[in-house]
Amino acid sequence: MMTYIVFILSTVFVVSFVSFSSKPSPIYGGFGFNVAGGIGCGIVLNFGGSFLGLMVFLIYLGGMLVVFGYTTAMATEPYPEAWTSNKAVLAMFITGVLAELLTACYILKEDEVEVVFKFNGAGDWVIYDTGDSGFFSEEAMGIAALYSYGTWLVVVTGWSLLIGVLVIMEVTRGN
Amino acid sequence: MNPPIFIIIMLTVISGTMIVVTTSHWLLVWIGFEMNLLAIIPILMKKYNPRAMEAATKYFLTQAAASMILMMWIIINLLHSGQWTVLKDLNPMASIMMTTALAMKLGLAPFHFWVPEVTQGISMSSGLILLTWQKIAPLSILYQISSTINPNLILTMSILSVMIGGWGGLNQTQLRKIMAYSSIAHMGWMTAIMMYSPTMMILNLTIYIIMTLTTFMLFMHNSTTTTASLSQTWNKTPLITSLILVLMMSLGGLPPLSGFIPKWMIIQELTKNELIMMPTLLAMTALLNLYFYMRLTYTTALTMFPSNNSMKMKWRFECTKKMTFLPPLVVMSTMLLPLAPMLSILD
């Protein structure tokens, strides 16, 4: 199973995206969001990015999604819609899950699949230890490069985050 | 809006576009587009009515979807070429989809449906920024990938845009919607020439921005948003009446005004590349555009539109709006044709 772990995690990732894309109430959607975040962390971990995967848990799930959860709790409605509450949400959910399962079965059955790029069945999702990255992990070197050579990128992303907050406040200010 | 916040937000809109225009890394292109989008949302929502909120939401959704498509194909291009540099040799499939994503951002047909509705829902000055500044970033990326764009795709989109810009604007009385359809048609002209001579696209963009800027400023001068209220400008500011006449003729692409320069150059470049039907079709459908500009001219400057007698006798107050740079802009939008021989420096 460990050879196909990335493939399995990707499939469950898509299913959890379907679970909040079928638009239940935000409380239930938030649950799907959390699961998706955790699985995304797992996928990143499997590619060797241990620091970034745990950053996903810490900052994304533990920071941003917690704030999302609190604001959703403040804006809650008396009769929230779950996935089986009305037929539209259920139909969308079933459609999404069915599409994903059919895609997964197609990938597993056929030897070679070409959707946008060719890959050989599920075997291409396996991470072999190709290439000699030396004693340092590439991911940690990438983060180090961000804070040394990539100062401009830090400035741009930091400014974008600040602007995100200012824009949200300006939009919700009203009057 | 609170002045310091307004300054910061305008700064971000400008720097977002500048990042897209000047960068050589695909990730920064996407970041620049997102910065631009995020910061322009409060500008679109300057007035807090539901119409403006709806327009800002529509703009956000379409542009965010386009950015997502662009990002996906940036990553697939990375998969095939192994590097992040914005070069001219893209994977062909990535080039097609990136062109589609950028066409969604520009408002080219068949992705033009958001342009009239968003432009109508926002204030005149926000519409000005939307139709002029926001076109610079996507067109700069199209300029950079122009040698690998699929001809069938881009020429289809451009002919469709000119046609839809012409026919769509015919039944409009709201000035912002007229300007939106005018923008769709001009984008069609710009993308038609992009594959053959990207420099002419820049020329068209420059002259289009100058003309649209002037038009919006003249509309803002009297706070007119409909044809009916524009038809009363002879009473409020007679000078604007004659300026609207000249400007509409320039927008329609009539010689001897500057609006003729891009059309002339584009038709010349297209015929040099042995396309005959295409510039014929473009020129003929541009006449539809000219028809509704003529209608505006007719009601504004050439006839006295029906109104009550009390509307024919108004006090003439001095305009308190700060119309920076308007006289030079009017001159540039109408009198640049004699300078057209300077384009020979391009050879």
UniProtKB/Swiss-Prot annotation, chain B:
GO terms for molecular function: NADH dehydrogenase (ubiquinone) activity. GO terms for cellular component: mitochondrial inner membrane; respiratory chain complex I. It comes from the Eukaryota. Signal peptide: none annotated. It holds the Pfam family NADH_dehy_S2_C. Its EC number is 7.1.1.2. It is found in: Mitochondrion inner membrane. The keyword Electron transport applies. Keywords: Electron transport, Membrane, Mitochondrion, Mitochondrion inner membrane, NAD, Respiratory chain, Translocase, Transmembrane, Transmembrane helix, Transport, Ubiquinone. It catalyses: a ubiquinone + NADH + 5 H(+)(in) = a ubiquinol + NAD(+) + 4 H(+)(out). The chain crosses the membrane at residues 3-23, 25-45, 59-79, 96-116, 122-142, 149-169, 178-198, 200-220, 242-262, 274-294, 325-345. Disulfide bonds: none annotated. The keyword Translocase applies. GO terms for biological process: mitochondrial electron transport, NADH to ubiquinone; mitochondrial respiratory chain complex I assembly. It is an enzyme of class 7 (translocase). It is a multi-pass membrane protein. Core subunit of the mitochondrial membrane respiratory chain NADH dehydrogenase (Complex I) which catalyzes electron transfer from NADH through the respiratory chain, using ubiquinone as an electron acceptor. Essential for the catalytic activity and assembly of complex I. Core subunit of respiratory chain NADH dehydrogenase (Complex I) which is composed of 45 different subunits. Interacts with TMEM242. Belongs to the complex I subunit 2 family. This is NADH-ubiquinone oxidoreductase chain 2.
